[in-house]
Amino acid sequence: MEQPRKAVVVTGFGPFGEHTVNASWIAVQELEKLGLGDSVDLHVYEIPVEYQTVQRLIPALWEKHSPQLVVHVGVSGMATTVTLEKCGHNKGYKGLDNCRFCPGSQCCVEDGPESIDSIIDMDAVCKRVTTLGLDVSVTISQDAGRYLCDFTYYTSLYQSHGRSAFVHVPPLGKPYNADQLGRALRAIIEEMLDLLEQSEGKINYCHKH
């Protein structure tokens, strides 16, 4: 019997500040060209750097696609590696977005937990991708920056009960080009899907015995 295709949603961000071309969206477009194989329906979206749009769009994406996984990709001017974020944070949002707006509460979800971890083992993903010998360094972080990246990640983790991931990429050419970033994203997401499948297999096995 043919396995049902999995839906995977991957988002990048639009321009903001000095990032007139956002490396995250360029990387996601490269990933779209490469695809994630015949068993995955890949849906990509560019997200504006706007708090209120994020609060509206993230739940809508989960409702529309019922995805196996959502991966958000953002650019960090400080990054020199491709960075896997372990968690999103609820509070501390003071930076203005592209609409010159900032949440009055400075938080994602009032009365929500301080932080939410992804259910994906980012250390395992990092180790597995590193062994593939890609020409891209992959590292781990626990601080997505308290701006739209972190805000988006927390919103998605809250919506999905942890079934989301966030990947920070450096600006284009510092040091990686679009093709390298796209291939790194593909390898990372394939490992994430594999780990999710393994963990679900264990859960199903436990339920049967």
UniProtKB/Swiss-Prot annotation:
Summarize the activity regulation: Inhibited by transition metal ions including Ni(2+), Zn(2+), and Cu(2+) and by sulfhydryl-blocking agents.
Gene Ontology MF term list: pyroglutamyl-peptidase activity
The EC number of this protein is: 3.4.19.3
Q: Which CDD domains match?
A: Peptidase_C15 (cd00501)
Q: Which GO terms describe its cellular component?
A: cytosol
The annotated active site, in chain numbering, is 85, 149, 168
Primary location class:
cytoplasm
- Entry keyword Nucleotidyltransferase: no
Could you mention a single GO BP entry for this protein?
protein catabolic process
Name the Pfam families for this protein: Peptidase_C15 (PF01470)
* UniProt record similarity statement: Belongs to the peptidase C15 family.
Name of the protein in question: Pyroglutamyl-peptidase 1
Taxonomic placement: Eukaryota, Metazoa, Chordata, Craniata, Vertebrata
Q: Which gene produces this protein?
A: PGPEP1
